[in-house]
Amino acid sequence: MTNPIYLILADFFDRYIGEPPEKIHPVVFIGKLICFFENVFKSTNSVNKTRDLLFGFLNVILVLAIVFFMTYEIEQIINSISNSYIKISIYSIILSFSIGHKSLIEFSKAPIKFIVNNDLEGAKKSVQCIVSRNTSELDKKHILSASIESASENITDSIIAPLIYAAIFGLPGAFLYRAVNTFDAMIGYKSEKYQYYGKTAAYLDDILNFIPSRIAGMLLIISAPFYGGNIKSAIYGYFNEGNKTPSPNSGYTMATLANSLNMELEKIGYYKLGKGEITIEKALNSLKAVDYSVLLFLIIYTVLLM
């Protein structure tokens, strides 16, 4: 198991310093790798089930192999450093590149700020950056809902899951997870072009998020009193509404947070989670929930390894 200090410092560096420039960001590099092999394997938009399933699978395997080899070698080099302070610093900084804590908070808070300033059009444009739905017709309630949904879902994708895989498998685990997550974001959605080509990526993302999403939901339950939530309501949401979204995983954090803060999250035509009015205070408390759930995870992991 990975030393807890690496995870603690990695989250600290990401939360308070942020991500590196795009030119040197590992996740951006992974995205370019995905695009490179996609251009090799899928040069046209035409759909062929057998071909697309095979080449989509090969795209995933090749990118993951490259990511594993590179991160494994980097980890070996870091572990060979004799000075423990330098080793811990370098390892933690690189690991922080697999986490999106600061960006999650900033992107989720942006639409809320526009709502506070009564700028509905600005809020629509802002929330469009973090959700895939059409935001042009959304009202204040549904803009806040979309922002909170994104924050609660990405507790898993951007923070808890990479930390879990880093804890178990080190740098390779964290970045292999982020590679799969990036695959899902780029080609895993259900469009005509990617309906077969993206299947491997989508299934693998669902598998890797299965346990982390449920752990993240439990963290939101336990930390509820610290962000203004209700434990009993959070438990209800987790067990009764966690499976009410099209995704097999994202509903557990969204439903837990919605019920914990007594608010209704709705993606029109897809799901409704929780009950109650969404207020600015509840939206901001949702962002506090992100911080407290991550802090709780780090505390529990550290205690378990003591």
From Swiss-Prot:
Cysteine-cysteine disulfides: none
Gene Ontology biological process terms from the UniProt entry: cobalamin biosynthetic process
UniProt main location, coarse: membrane
InterPro entries per the UniProt record, alphabetical: Cobalamin_biosynth_CobD/CbiB
Subcellular location: Cell membrane
Any GO MF annotation of the entry: threonine-phosphate decarboxylase activity
One Gene Ontology CC term in the entry: plasma membrane
Pfam family, one: CobD_Cbib
Transmembrane segments: 54-74, 88-108, 155-175, 215-235, 286-306
Protein's pathway: Cofactor biosynthesis; adenosylcobalamin biosynthesis
Membrane topology category: Multi-pass membrane protein
Keywords: Cell membrane, Cobalamin biosynthesis, Membrane, Transmembrane, Transmembrane helix
Function as written in the Swiss-Prot or TrEMBL entry: Converts cobyric acid to cobinamide by the addition of aminopropanol on the F carboxylic group.
Entry similarity comment: Belongs to the CobD/CbiB family.
Protein name from the UniProt record: Probable cobalamin biosynthesis protein CobD
Upper classification of the organism: Archaea, Methanobacteriati, Methanobacteriota, Methanomada group, Methanococci
